């Protein structure tokens, strides 16, 4: 009887912690979203689903990778997917539908595979925290990116499909390419 009572009290205690924690996360996240984009926060409506074309667009995945690199090359930050530039909560359903099983696990796996292939498994493991909080009863994805220990270069495609390596940093509320003539100076100042 005593064991059951202790178990019941422990479960109630733990469930209260979870509720409080979820409420705090929800409140903090809503505040973050209402503040809008800045040097430490970027919103993306989707990871790969093009809302204008109503289909998968691999260029959007490049933009996600560019944003992750820009945060890493600067002071770190938070990428929020499922929220548009006007702070509207869109959710992840459009992206989920583009994946075989349409789950958040598959979404995270796809995201991590993109990052692994672009920047290496060690970076993806040590520098990213991927979460799927609910805001206004809608699941979104937050990616916390730590300030990087070494520079990240992003492979981007031009209009003709030609790929090249570019260096991006966070500047204000956008990811900016640093001109090739300035990269060495920035890298020397930032990473050494």
Where are these regions (language model features)?
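Conserved N-terminal catalytic/coupling substructures associated with nucleotide/phosphate chemistry
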Residues: 1-192
């Amino acid at each position: 009887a005593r064991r059951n009572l202790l178990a019941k009290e422990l479960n109630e205690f733990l469930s209260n912690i979870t509720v409080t924690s979820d409420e705090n996360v929800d409140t903090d996240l809503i505040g973050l979203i209402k503040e809008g984009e800045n040097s430490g926060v970027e919103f993306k409506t989707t990871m790969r689903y093009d809302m204008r074309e109503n289909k998968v667009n691999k260029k959007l995945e490049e933009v996600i990778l560019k944003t992750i690199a820009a945060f890493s090359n600067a002071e770190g930050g938070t990428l929020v997917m499922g929220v548009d530039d006007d702070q509207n909560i869109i959710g992840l359903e459009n992206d989920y539908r583009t994946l075989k099983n349409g789950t958040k696990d598959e979404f995270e796996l796809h995201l991590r595979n993109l990052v692994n292939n672009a920047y290496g498994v060690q970076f993806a493991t040590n520098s990213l925290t991927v979460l799927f909080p609910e805001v206004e009863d809608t699941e979104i994805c937050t990616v916390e990116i730590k300030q990087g220990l070494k520079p990240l270069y992003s492979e981007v495609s031009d209009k003709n499909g030609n790929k090249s390596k570019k260096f991006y940093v966070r500047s204000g509320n956008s990811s900016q390419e640093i001109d090739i003539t300035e990269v060495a100076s920035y890298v020397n100042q930032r990473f050494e």
